[in-house]
Amino acid sequence: MAKAVTVKIKLVSTADTGYFYVTKKNSRTQTDKLSFKKYDPVARKHVEFKEAKIK
């Protein structure tokens, strides 16, 4: 079997609330770490989410 191109990643809130999103990315085309501004329902505002590995 071939190695999977898409990998699951976790987007962790930088507001230190512990909230995270799980998404996937193409590891061949997106080699750098992802970072998005998304809504954090615990902080109740839009904050930056940074990529982390799923353990």
UniProtKB/Swiss-Prot annotation:
Cystine bridges: none
Keywords assigned by UniProt, alphabetized: Ribonucleoprotein, Ribosomal protein
Domain of life: Bacteria
A biological-process GO annotation: translation
The keyword Cell division belongs to this UniProt entry's keyword annotation: no
Entry GO MF terms: structural constituent of ribosome
Signal peptide: none
Membrane spanning stretches: none
InterPro entries to which the protein is assigned, alphabetical: Ribosomal_bL33 (IPR001705), Ribosomal_bL33_CS (IPR018264), Ribosomal_bL33_sf (IPR038584), Ribosomal_zn-bd (IPR011332)
Pfam families tied to this protein: Ribosomal_L33
One Gene Ontology term, aspect cellular component: cytosolic large ribosomal subunit
Family: Belongs to the bacterial ribosomal protein bL33 family.
Name used for this protein in its record: Large ribosomal subunit protein bL33
Gene that this polypeptide is encoded by: rpmG
